[in-house]
């Protein structure tokens, strides 16, 4: 290999905050890029190297194909040499599609379907007996053998347990010359006027021929009649001895000889929940159905229906007919639309919700007569169900969003497949049962089942099993043994979906590729981290270059080469501070090196907080893998929940406790996982879940609008003398309202180019040059800065700029306090990472007036944070705890765990081997626990 191709050489990289840097990255090695959050790590790895790799790939397409992709912009870099094909494995949650599962993403389910299509056995749904299939020759031989010298009838089963009068069928059969049929066990002549009871279920077998085996029946006649019967019965025939009521069935398909129940031979799509051939008819292969929940119908029972008390009516536009029917129902009970909801009796509500078809006599006392009231109303719930099923209007979407809950499909019990697909089994398990096994159990089952195959099936299954086992092992190697193939992709964390993609890439066995990963250690316990590092080394050892953006100490120390970018974030970063082998970090003069060598550290508190003596107690939590857990959260403390990936931390906190609290305080829709009872809810006055979901989904949303300070900034600009002269109000300085904004881009600063089947592309508006406002608005300046200049400021600059204005200053200061000084005020929320979005939410909470009695829940807040940023974040959190608030943090980061006042360790392992609280107490108590794996790693840290 020549010298020039031993490195990926980047010259003059200026993307985002990069300061025209040159860097040589060794190929076929594991290289870690580290540095403070916002220092430019992702700008180098993803926005420069990956973007250029992707652009070069698209350049290879034909001009015709490129017109649909649009010109991918060349990153701001002079040149990059020695670049291999690039694959980026990012943290983004893979798929919000409810049909996507771990099995479909990894393609393991496709191989499993193939395995079941080729080597499974079918069993009868009624008798449980194994189904058999025959060839035509075997059927003929069996008939000759079993019915020697007997008089028999050959029949074609055409209807099996179905309702209908079947008049057309009998007319058709009579025209073809067939004279008799066995209908519901009775032999009947076929007449042109024959009609059955249409509301009863029937079995109909057409008599095709009569034989005396060995005498009247010639070989040629038997073969011809048998073929006719087979065609008519779709592979199934029946044989009945004359004078007997018993019938014996034979099938080319799989069949139960007792009942005649028949199944087609399986194909891979027999087991696909995305194909009509395999999916459950009721839920269409989703495993869940949406059910209307009346608990969400009424928020304030003191209001009447006239005052908007019955919420679904607010979402239904054409509600005049419904209102008239409800009015009639209430009139029967002597009530009206002005009656408070709490005074409406249960019987009346039953009529309103589920319908009524009756006539009532209503006495009109004042007139001394009675009045007839006829009610013919299907009910509010059936009306809503019909609207939701059609999904043709926006109101249907609103009704589904506001008034339904997701329930397991009662037909398939969540298996997603038809009963016939679940009749096929290998070693007693159907495909849905195997799909529901944890990956570690699946490995055991495959090893066990291999030895039980017949010689023929062993040969057929050999290659399929090899593929399944190889891919499965890669998933186990990246610490995902607790997941099952049936787990829905939308429930995976960013870290889990990234590791699934990593395992899929390792499974593809590509070589000479540059892999770029974004913090693969997210969501991993220290123990699983070691397995992940080995997987990355494996990827390197087969002949690939691996570039990892990472803050994890173990990952940095295990790398072949480390790049440290800094020195600070935003415009104060973007330089290569140090590059070399991890062992030489001792001599480096950077913040990262100081934390790794121990010169800087996050100090362990001298005393742990006592809390306020109150607590929230959750009893009997059994959701997912939880084993009847009793959880006590002491209040007024920093509580950290730890445990192996998949041990049940999220099920306990995000799946059970948070939905209970959210329902109690805010009447939220999400149902908690099963539990027995909860105590102590009155010990807090509100609950805040600071998660990593985006703060906005369009480029119009930004930190200034989310925190609410943009309103104050607009008010400030409207109070300036220039604005007063021109008559500008605060709305003039909004980019969402006509008047002050640029009308070409409607205040977006960007124009959206729709790409039909591809994601939309955003380009700068040529009229305002991305400034969002028109020329007149930009002429109004405060301290020499226009409203657009203010949005372009970093938070650090805004802190100095707005010092004289307390209201705005307080809000920008909290953003600076959580370590976000490097982002700009108007940065599009779509470009913020999950960790940044989470800290903006935290800053917004910090800026609010404190009641000192709030419970905050954070899930892995250190995602994307450097050691120094973790310190800043924990200082901000501790400020809130000092004010009397309580925190529950789910975290694997030892720097956070060691600061806890109280630790709850869930385990001992992931999946079915987890789901218990194995240790609780202060960090000092946890490190003494023999059971706690977290304690073992925490001991090293402390």
Regions found by a protein language model. Give the residues of each.
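Conserved phosphate-binding elements of NTP-dependent enzyme cores
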Residues: 1-942
């Amino acid at each position: 290999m020549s010298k020039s191709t031993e490195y990926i050489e980047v010259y003059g990289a200026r993307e985002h905050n990069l300061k025209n840097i040159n860097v040589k990255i060794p190929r076929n090695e594991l290289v870690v890029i580290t540095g403070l959050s916002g220092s430019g790590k992702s700008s180098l790895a993803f926005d420069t190297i990956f973007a250029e790799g992707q652009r070069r790939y698209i350049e290879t397409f034909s001009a015709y194909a490129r017109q649909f992709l649009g010109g991918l912009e060349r990153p701001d870099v002079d040149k990059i040499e020695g670049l291999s094909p690039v694959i980026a494995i990012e943290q983004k949650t893979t798929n919000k599609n409810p049909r996507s599962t771990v099995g479909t993403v990894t393609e393991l389910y496709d191989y499993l379907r193939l395995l079941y299509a080729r080597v499974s056995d079918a069993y009868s749904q009624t008798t449980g007996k194994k189904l058999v299939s025959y060839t035509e020759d075997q059927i003929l031989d069996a008939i000759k053998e079993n019915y020697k010298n007997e008089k028999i009838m050959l029949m074609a089963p055409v209807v099996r347990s179905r309702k209908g009068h079947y008049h057309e069928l009998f007319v058709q059969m009579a025209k073809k010359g067939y004279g008799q049929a066995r209908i519901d066990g009775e032999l009947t002549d076929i007449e042109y006027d024959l009609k059955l009871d249409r509301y009863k279920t029937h079995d109909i077998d057409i008599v095709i021929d009569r034989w005396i085996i060995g005498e009247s029946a010639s070989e040629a006649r038997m073969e011809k009649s048998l073929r006719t019967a087979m065609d008519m019965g779709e592979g199934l025939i029946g044989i009945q001895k004359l004078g007997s009521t018993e019938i014996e069935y034979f099938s080319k398909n799989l069949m139960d000889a007792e009942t005649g129940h028949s199944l087609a031979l399986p194909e891979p799509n027999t087991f696909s929940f995305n194909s009509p051939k395999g999916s459950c008819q009721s839920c269409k292969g989703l495993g869940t159905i949406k059910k209307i929940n009346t608990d969400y119908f009424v928020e304030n029972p003191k209001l009447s229906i006239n005052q908007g008390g019955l919420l679904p009516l607010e979402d239904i536009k054409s509600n005049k007919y419904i209102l008239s029917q409800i009015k009639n129902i209430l009139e029967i009970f002597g009530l009206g639309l002005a009656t408070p909801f709490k005074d409406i009796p249960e019987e009346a509500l039953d009529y309103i919700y589920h319908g009524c078809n009756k006539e009532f006599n209503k006495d009109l006392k004042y007139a001394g007569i009675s009045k007839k009231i006829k009610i013919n109303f299907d009910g509010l719930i059936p009306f809503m169900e019909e609207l939701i099923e059609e999904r043709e209007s926006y109101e249907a979407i609103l009704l589904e969003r506001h008034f339904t809950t997701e329930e397991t499909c009662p037909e398939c019990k969540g298996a997603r497949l038809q009963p016939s697909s679940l009749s096929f089994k290998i070693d007693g398990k159907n495909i849905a049962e195997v799909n529901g096994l944890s990956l570690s159990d699946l490995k055991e089952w495959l090893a066990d089942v291999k030895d039980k195959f017949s010689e023929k099936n062993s040969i057929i299954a050999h290659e399929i099993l090899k593929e399944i086992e190889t891919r499965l092992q890669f998933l186990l190697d990246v610490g995902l043994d607790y997941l099952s193939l049936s787990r829905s992709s939308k429930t995976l964390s960013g870290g889990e979906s990234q590791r699934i993609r990593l395992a899929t890439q390792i499974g593809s066995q590509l070589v000479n590729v540059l892999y770029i990963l974004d913090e693969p250690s997210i969501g991993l316990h220290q123990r699983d981290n070691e397995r992940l590092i080995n997987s990355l080394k494996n990827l390197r050892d087969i002949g690939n270059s691996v570039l990892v953006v990472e803050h994890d100490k173990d990952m940095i120390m295990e790398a072949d080469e480390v790049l440290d970018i800094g020195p600070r974030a935003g415009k104060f970063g973007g330089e290569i501070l140090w590059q070399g082998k991890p062992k030489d970090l001792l001599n480096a003069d950077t913040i990262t090196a100081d934390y790794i060598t121990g010169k800087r550290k996050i100090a362990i508190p001298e005393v742990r907080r006592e809390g306020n003596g109150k607590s929230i107690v959750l009893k009997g939590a059994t959701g997912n893998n939880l084993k009847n857990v009793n959880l006590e959260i002491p209040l007024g403390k920093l509580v950290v929940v730890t445990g192996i990936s998949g041990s049940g931390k999220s099920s306990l906190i995000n799946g059970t406790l948070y939905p209970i609290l959210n329902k109690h305080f805010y009447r939220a829709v999400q149902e908690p996982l099963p539990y027995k009872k909860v105590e102590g809810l009155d010990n807090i006055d509100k609950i805040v879940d600071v998660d990593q979901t985006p703060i906005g989904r369009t480029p119009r949303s930004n930190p200034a609008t989310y925190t609410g300070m943009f309103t104050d900034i607009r008010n400030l600009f409207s109070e300036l003398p220039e604005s007063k002269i021109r008559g500008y109000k605060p709305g003039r300085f909004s980019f969402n309202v006509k008047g002050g904004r640029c009308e070409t881009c409607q205040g977006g600063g960007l124009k959206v180019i729709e790409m039909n089947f591809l994601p939309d592309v955003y380009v700068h508006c040529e009229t305002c040059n991305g400034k969002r406002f028109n020329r007149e608005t930009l002429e109004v300046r405060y301290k020499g800065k226009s409203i657009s200049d203010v949005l372009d400021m970093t938070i650090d600059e805004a802190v100095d700029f707005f010092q004289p204005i307390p209201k705005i200053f307080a809000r920008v200061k909290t953003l600076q306090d959580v370590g976000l000084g490097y982002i700009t005020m108007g940065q599009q929320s779509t470009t913020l990472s999950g960790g940044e979005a989470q800290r903006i939410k935290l800053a917004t909470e910090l800026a609010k007036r404190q009641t000192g009695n709030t419970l905050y829940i954070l899930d892995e807040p250190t995602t994307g944070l450097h050691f120094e940023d973790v310190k800043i974040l924990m200082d901000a959190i501790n400020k809130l705890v000092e004010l009397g608030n309580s925190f529950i943090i789910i975290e694997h980061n030892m720097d956070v765990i060691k600061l806890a006042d109280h630790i709850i360790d869930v385990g001992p392992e992931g999946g079915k081997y987890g789901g218990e609280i194995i240790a609780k107490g202060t960090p000092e108590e946890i490190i003494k626990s023999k059971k706690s794996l977290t304690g073992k790693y925490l001991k090293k840290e402390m």
